[in-house]
Each structure stands twice: as structure tokens, then as C-alpha cells.
Amino acid sequence: MLEDIERIKENDYDYYRYLYLGEAVGLGNNVYNMSTFHAIETLPSDDKLIGISFALDGGHQQSATAVCAFGITAKGKVILLDTWYYSPAGQIVKKAPSQLSQDINSFINRIVDKYKVPVLQYTIDSAEGALRNQMYLDFAIRWHPVAKLKKVTMIDSFQSLLAQGRFYYLNTENNKIFVEEHKMYRWDEKTIKSDNPNVIKEDDHTCDTANILY
């Protein structure tokens, strides 16, 4: 516990002040301190990848669907390996759940074949029933539905990981959308001082995958 506190103090002093000293911390209305997102070009040679966790945020008629592959290392780091992203915006014919199921399964197989480590978990927003059922029907992949809690509670779990200096992402074209959405992720100023602050629900699909990871 003391080691975790010291790690947070070293990696994200603002979050340490907020969490342990009870001080007001100014990030404006930005949710995350982007200096805690560490880009890497290759996987670390001294910290073995032991498994992969997939997290899925399902979209609807006008909303994007995102799947992120998070690698877990022996030393407890979390590395974003790859991102699959589909947006129906501006498309006359939207993809059906049966088509999304095929695309996502191909993404999963490509990642597993590349890294050759076990899949530790599949997590999905509990509201996304159609795609979850479709993937079980097509491939017997059982996604674990995660009920959404208060937004601030879900964000805190990922924020703690960031503050401990344990989050990394491969600096690839596919992962740019993850970084950009987290840069733009903001609290709604109308709710920021309330008992239940909420975020602005725009272009936040990869953010939601990170929020349901744990």
C-alpha cells in the first residue's frame, strides 16, 4: 500500500494531492493527465507479456464501436497493444451486429496469433446485448458484461493505474484514436461540482473501454 502511494506521488503528483491530501487539483475540465500515458515503440524486453484482456464498447446506429487489446505484463503493467474502431457516421449502410461480430473476431484472432499469450478476459458494456449475443452465437466467445457505475467511480480505477505509472501504449496508427479520445475526454462543467459529475458524451468510445477494463 505504501509503495503504491509513493508510486502515485512520483508519477502523478496532482492525483496524489487530490486522493491523499484532499486538495483541489486544477486540470481544468480535462479528465486525465496525459503525461501519465506512456508511448513505447516495442514491448519491454525485461517484462514478459503474460496475457491479453479485450474490452469492447458497443455503438448504436450513429455511434462508434471500439475494441481495445490490453496486454498484461508479469510486473503488472498494462500495455495497449492495438485498437479496433468502427464508426458508422456518414455511412448510408451501417454494419449489422453479424458483420461487426466477424470483424471483431478477426481482430481478436490477429492479436492472439501475433502475441501468443492467453486471453485473460473479455469485458463489454452490459448495455450492449445484441453484439454480445451475436459473438457467442458465431464464435462461442462469452463477453463478461460490466454494469456501468457512477462515471467518477469508473474513471477512478483507470486513473489509479495511470497515476501508478503502469499504463503504456504501443505508438501505432491504430492506437492514435485511443490517445486522441483521451486527450479530448472532459468533464461536463454543468455537473463537475455536483455529487455525481459526468463527462461530455462525445467521441469517448475508447475511453469507455478503459473504464470497463477493471
Question: Locations of the language-model features?
Answer:
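ATPase catalytic-site recognition across NTP-hydrolyzing enzymes
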Residues: M1-G59
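A residue-level signal for conserved active-site and pocket-lining positions in enzyme catalytic cores
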Residues: Y20, V67, Y122, H182, ...
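Anionic group-transfer/hydrolysis microenvironments
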Residues: D57-G59, A127, A210
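Coil-to-beta-strand transition motifs
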Residues: H60-A64, G76
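Short beta-strand scaffold segments in enzyme catalytic cores
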Residues: A64-F70
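Mg2+-dependent endonuclease catalytic cores in nucleic-acid-processing enzymes, primarily RNase H-like
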Residues: K77-V199
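Acidic, Mg2+-coordinating catalytic module of metal-dependent nucleases/exonucleases
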Residues: N196-Y214
